[in-house]
Amino acid sequence: VRSSAASDVYKRQEINRILTDRISDILFCPTDKATENLVNEGYGNIRCQIVKNGDVMQDAALFYADKCRKPNINLPEKFVLCTVHRAENTDDSGRLKNIFMALENISDKCKVVLPLHPRTKAKLIGIGYDFSCSNICFIQPVGYLEMVWLLKNCELVMTDSGGLQKEAYFFGKYCVTMRDETEWVELVDNGFNRLVGSNQAMIEDTYALLVDAPKTGFENRLYGNGDAGNKILESLQLL
């Protein structure tokens, strides 16, 4: 499941995904691009079955959309939802400083709500970040139902997460991705996601470009119709 969706083949988790693909009899792909990648890698000549089934994360998002709950904290009426936790950002003090300088400036315009990952908090403390003077609305990490509520009610998503890029799309929100690459290239190709790395000016400019942009095209369902799990089950029942 989630076969061929990778962004950097030198990362341990991506290597594990490739190895899992190699030993699998059925490869369930979430997107057209993932299916195309497998064919280009020669899987059409290997004794395996390739099935495009859609994304099981969208199944979950649609199922829980009406079951979400607001975090038990005071939140601004309009806000940007942000997460920062990837090692390439948190372990590089220069990247981390650039990202948070951009977020501080953005939060002057539209409050940035940021569930703070423990590793990110420790790294910020390590570079002398002054939380008492910050304009960002830091909150404790939230559960899935609270995150769904934040996704449904935010103006825009800013993240370095892989999954949150897709979840932003599921809930009709543009995403500013603070990474240099993404496994979800169809979101970039269709204009729903912008890669900005850790460039402060690019982060701020892309926020300004997308925060009030008309939300069009989200109905195209790049990841299926929310029935990926059923398609997987149907394929397995034919074995």
Each model region followed by its residue ranges:
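A nucleotide-sugar donor-handling region in carbohydrate enzymes
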Residues: 23-95, 196
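Donor-nucleotide binding loops and adjacent catalytic segments primarily
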Residues: 67-153
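Alpha-helix C-terminal capping/helix-to-coil transition sites in glycosyltransferase folds
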Residues: 5, 22-23, 152-153
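Leloir-type glycosyltransferase catalytic cores
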Residues: 33, 194-239
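Membrane-proximal helix-turn-helix segments that form the acceptor-binding/catalytic region
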Residues: 14-26
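Single conserved hydrophobic/aromatic residue that forms the stacking wall/gate
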Residues: 1-6, 10
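A donor-sugar binding/catalytic signature common to diverse glycosyltransferases
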Residues: 27, 150-187
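Short beta-strand scaffold positions
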Residues: 1, 29, 52, 115, ...
